[in-house]
């Protein structure tokens, strides 16, 4: 091997060793900094989620207080388990709720329920009309029995949509005839408030969905 070949080989080995060394060094730096960088991303995402959840609860509380209802709720649709033929079970769950003092919350029992059990409510949701519905006028079924257990006297319900598709609903419940009569007397203001609250919640949910994609 002549001197030129030796120099070329030494030069080649030098660059190989330098490249390996830099790769190891860079990997070590990334490994060391990753724990600091990753939580920051998670922290920002978690912060946004908490803000959205907090705002939704604030909107529901405002709706409950101004409409003088017992409960203001946001219920969302989702996929559940699967039937034997592979078809997904469509379900609903209460995700946010504001209740008056002394009123029992429904969050614990309104979770992972088949949407088909609430078909009469779905029909009202699709109408998209902020009207007061008397529970006594509802046809017999699971949805009526469910609300009777919660002492519901009347309710108002509106769809919550994502990309023009119904993804859940907003609901307020009155638990006494006195409160219902008061709501009827203020139906115009309550209807506007209901629509306004629904629209604000939709904006928040759309933001949350965009950030998670």
Predicted segments with their positions:
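Intrinsically disordered, low-complexity terminal regulatory regions
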Residues: 3-102, 198-201, 207-213
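Well-ordered, non-membrane alpha-helical segments in soluble/globular domains
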Residues: 52-59, 115-119, 187-197
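A structural signal for short, well-ordered beta-strand segments and their strand-loop junctions
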Residues: 71-76, 133-134, 157
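A short, aliphatic-rich beta-strand micro-motif
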Residues: 153-161
